[in-house]
């Protein structure tokens, strides 16, 4: 039997994190069922694979798992996802060419904006953010492209801005090396409005020099991404994955900087109990709960 860990497109945020987790997981279980990383252009489609029993673990944005559990749009029926652990808290943000007149999000009106693959979690994040700011999708031209394709389109001036996932990621790094770009900021009060009206968002800082073109700190929308499984997943398998994560909170950021917020997220587990990890009301899997109790993160 082979275990499968579902992620996004190759080279993306989720894919790069899963590669490190799966390596540690397999290393900790010599002789156990091997786990492999799979990739899908649209991670929300992984929920269907969970429902069909074709995935054992997966990475998703925390806001979508509650919808999957409840069968709310874009999902057509309840899907029994269970939480394993958070993966990162990272910024989602718009990027424009440095010679563009686009300075803040309001300047995107009337422009061509790449939002990620159609139907993807990133595209739906963009919808939520524009709606919270009262910006209609009719006021600009949405373009649905993968992140690598969008980067090329920005360089070729086929689009005016693109929507970017948490960094570091390969597509953003390569874009910043190929072209002069900048982060699109929020006008006064816009970021506070988004964070106050959408409970699964938070403010997060893109650090200066995070990539070429990030010339100053930039406050952006942050989202927690999480590792999930299905309620039918065997307790010992989920226990093993959760134990690997909780035992490597210092090592994981050295393997991939996307994990740098992980230890702080685990501090919430110790302070507030399982609810700190149960985003969208999705329960912690019993195997994960047992691992965290054994390692002292839960009573």
Each predicted region: which residue ranges?
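Bilobed "Venus flytrap"/periplasmic-binding protein-like clamshell domains
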Residues: 2-28, 33, 37, 90-156, ...
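Divalent cation-coordinating acidic motifs and surrounding scaffolds
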Residues: 32, 38-58
